Amino acid sequence: MSLIRVNRFGPRGGGRKTLKVKKKAAVRQEWDNTVNDLTVHRATPEDLVRRHEMHKSKNRALVHWELQEKALKRKWKKQKPETSSLEKRKLSIMKEILSDQYLTQDVLEKSDHLMAAAKGLFADVPRKRTGFPNVTRAPDSSQSHTGINQDPVTQSILNESIIEPQALNEVDDAGEQSTAHSQSEDSENELPNSLSQHSNRSTERFLHQLKEENSELINQLWTDIQQKIATQSQRTPPGSPSSELSAEDQKAALNATDAVKRIQAGPQPEEAAEPVDFSSSYLGQVLNTRKQKPLLAKVKRKQDMHAASKQKTNMLSSSTASADRPSSTGSSLDVLKHVIHEVEHEMEEYERCTGREVTGLQGGQGLTGFTLSLVSSLCRLVRYLKESEIQLRKEVETRQQLEQMLGDHRELIDALTAEILSLREENSTMQARLQQYMVTTDEQLISLTHAIKNCPVINNSRQESQAPERAAMGRRLVDNVEGPVISSNGSMPLMFRGEEVVEFPQEELPVKLSQGPTPTENLNLANNFPTHIFEPAVMLTPPRQKSNSEFSPLQDVLRRTVQTRPAPRIPPTVEVIEKEQNWEKKALPIDPDIQNSSEENRLFTQRWRVSHMGEDLENKGQPAFVSLSQPPCSSLPSTQQPRNPVLSEEPTVLGDGQQLRTSEALVQRKDIMARIAELTLQNSAIKAHLNNITSSGGEQGDGLREPRKQGSASEVSTNFPAVQSLTPSSMEERIAELNRQSMEARSKLLQLIEQQKLVGLNLSSSPVSPVESPLRAWAEEGKRTIEVSVPGMEASESSKCNTVSPVSGNSSRRSSGAISNSCSPLNATSGSGKFTPVNPRTKTEKKNEEGWFALSAHIP
C-alpha cells in the first residue's frame, strides 16, 4: 500500500471555481437634444399612411376577387357536385341546335373566298368600276372634253337579269349611284357579326332560284315598268334642249358660254339611263323583299331630283332659245313682256291684299318699255319692303311697350291681391272681435236687466201703499191685547220699510243671526231689501252636546240643516236690530214715526229675538237657537249680476206649480208675498210677547207651569204647520191659515194676560231690551266677534229656575234673568269688538248649558 503525499499548499479540489464579479450595466442616458433635435425628421402619421398606401399591391382587389371566386367554386363543388354534369349537358344541347348554323357559316365563308379568288369568271374583277376623269379646261378653248366610253360592259348587260344590279359595274350616273348605295350598304353590313352576312348571301341565292321559277311574274312587272316610263315621258315638254340648240344659235345667245352647254349636256346621260334605273330598281324589289322599303324611298328621291333638274333645264333652254332668236318673229321681246306682265299681276295682287292703291299697267313698246316697267316694279317692291320694315319695327316697339305694360299690370294685380288678402284677414279678425263684443254686451245687458228687476226701488210704491194696512193691523192688535202698542211702521227697521233705502257703511252693517222660516218668505223679504245686504253665509260648526239622546228628532233635523244648508240672506237679526234707532240717527234725520215708546222698541226687539227657524222647530221643553254669520257687505254695481241665484232670477213658479207668464201676474204675486211677510212678522211679534209673559211667570208654582206648558204645546202644534206646509195649494189658503194662526195667538195672549192678573204679576216688570248700542263695537277697527250662548236641554230637573219657554229662541237667558230681575245683556267691549254675555248665573249653571257658538267676521 503506497501513500501519496499531497502538497498541502497546492490547489485543493480542482473543481473549485472563483466567483466572477458582474459588472453593473451602465445607465442608459437619455437622448441629448440640446445640440440637434432629430424629432423634426420624424415622419408624421399622414406620411406613414401615405407610404403604407404606396407600398400596397395594385392587384390587391383583383387577387381578393379571385380568391373569393375560388372559395365560392370550392363551396359549390362541395354543396352541388351535379352542376358540372348539368352544364356539360346544356353545352351539348346548344351545340346540337346550332351545329347546322355553324356549318352553313363555314360553307359560306369558303365560297366567299373562292368567289373573291376567281377573277375570270365573268371576264372582270369584282368591284371593278369605270373611272370618270375630272378635267378642267379653259373657258375659251374649243377643244372638246375628254371622251367617255358610253357603252357599258357587255358581260354586265348580259348578267343584269341574273345578278342584282347593285352588285354590278354600271356606266351611267344611275349605275354609279346604285353602286354607291350598294357599297354603303355593304359597308354597313360588314359588321363583326358574320352570321348576318352569310344569311343575307344565302337568301340571295335562294331568291335567285325563285326568280328562275317565276319568270312569268317578272315579265309582267317589266311591262308595267315600261308603261310607267312611257307616261312619264309624255308629261315632259316636247322640246328637248339638244334639238333646239344649233351651232348657228350658239353665237347669238345672251349667255352663250360653255357653262350653259355643260348644264344642258349634263342631264342627257341621266335621261338615257333612266329606263335602266327603273328596271334595276323594280328587279331589286322583286329579288330582295327585305329591302323593298328603302329602295322605294330611294327611287322616289331620284324621281324628284330628275324632275327638278328637268324643269331647270327647260327654263334655261327656253330663255336661251328666246334670247337667241331676235329675228323677224321677236319672240324674245314677247317672252320678256309676258314675264313683266306676270310680275305686274303679282304686284297688283300684293297691293290688293295689303290694302294699297293699285297702279295701272304702264304700256310700252320695245326694250325701253320693258326696262321702264321693270324699274318701276323694282321701285315699288323696294318701297313696299321699306314700309313693311317700318311697320314691323313699330309693331316690335308696340309689342315691347305692351309687354312692359303687362308687367306693370301684373305687379299691380299682385299688389291688389295681397291687399285684398290682408283686408280679408282684417275683416275676419274684426268679425271675430265684433262677435265677442256682441256676446259681452248681451251678457252685460242680461245682468243689467236682472239687476234692475231685483232693485228695491221698484217695490217702494207698493210698500208705501201697504203701509196703512199694516198700521191698521197694528192698531187692532193693540186694542185686542190691551198691552204695548206694536206699530209696523214705527218699530220696523228702516231697511224693512219701502220709504227710504239707505246703504250702511261697512262698520255699521248689521249681523244676521236668524234662519228664515220658509223659502217663500225668504224670497219675499229678499225682494224687499237692497242687493248689497246679501252675502253668502259662512258654514259654522255645530254646537257642543253632551249626548245625542238629549235632542229631539226635530232638533236633530234642525242641527243637520244648519250644518249642510247655507243660510239665506235676510234682514238684520236679533241682538243688533234693537240699536237701529242709533243707526238712523247717524245716517238719516230723525223721523217722528220712528221715535216710538220704549215699550214698542222692547216689543219689536223681543219679536226679532225670535229665530224663525227655531220658533217653528223647537220642542216643548227643548229650545234650539240658531246662530248664523253675516260678513260685512259691499254694495254691488248696477251692471253686475247679484251673487245670490235666488235673487238674480225672477221666480216664475208659485207654490202650486202655476207659471207666471205676464208682468201683471208677477206684480200680483209680489203683493201677495209682501202681505204674507207682514202677517208672519205680526205673528212672530205676538209669539214673542207671549213668550215674555210666560217667562216672567216662570217663578210661580208648578200649578202655573202646567197651563203654560199646555199653551206652549198647542202653540207648537199651531206653529209646525207653518213650517211644514211649505207649498200650500194656493196663496189665498196660506193667507187664511196665517190669519187663523194670528187669531189663535191673540186669544192665547188674552188668556195669559188674565192668568197674570189673577196671579198678581206686574206687567211693568217685564224685561227691557238688554242689548246696548252696537255703535261702539262696530266703530272699532279690526276684527269683530259676536259670541251668543246657545242653551240646550237642562242636565237635570233640579235647576227649576232655568225652565225654558217653548217658543222663544233665547228664553233661557230671559228666564234666568227673571230671577235676578234683569236679562243677560251683551257688553260691547271697545278693544276687540267682541260681544260677551254677562250672566249673573254661577259657573256651575253655565256648565249646564249646551255650549258656546262663536261667530267672527273681519272688517278690511
From Swiss-Prot:
Primary location class: cytoplasm
Summary of subunit composition and partner proteins: Interacts with CEP120.
Modification Phosphothreonine, positions: T236
Domain of life: Eukaryota
Keywords: Cell cycle, Cell division, Coiled coil, Cytoplasm, Cytoskeleton, Mitosis, Phosphoprotein
Modified residues (Phosphoserine): S240, S648, S765, S766, S769, S824
Coiled coil: 383-439, 729-757
One Gene Ontology cellular component: centriole
InterPro entries associated with the record: SPICE1
Region feature Disordered, mapped onto this chain: 127-150, 172-201, 230-250, 294-332, 623-645, 693-718, 792-860
Protein name as it appears in the record: Spindle and centriole-associated protein 1
Gene Ontology BP terms: cell division; metaphase chromosome alignment; mitotic spindle assembly; regulation of centriole replication
Ranges annotated as biased composition (Polar residues): 139-150, 190-200, 230-245
Intracellular or extracellular location(s): Cytoplasm, Cytoskeleton, Microtubule organizing center, Centrosome, Centriole; Cytoplasm, Cytoskeleton, Spindle
Residue ranges with Low complexity bias: 317-329, 627-642, 804-824
Summary of the function given for this chain in its UniProt record: Regulator required for centriole duplication, for proper bipolar spindle formation and chromosome congression in mitosis.
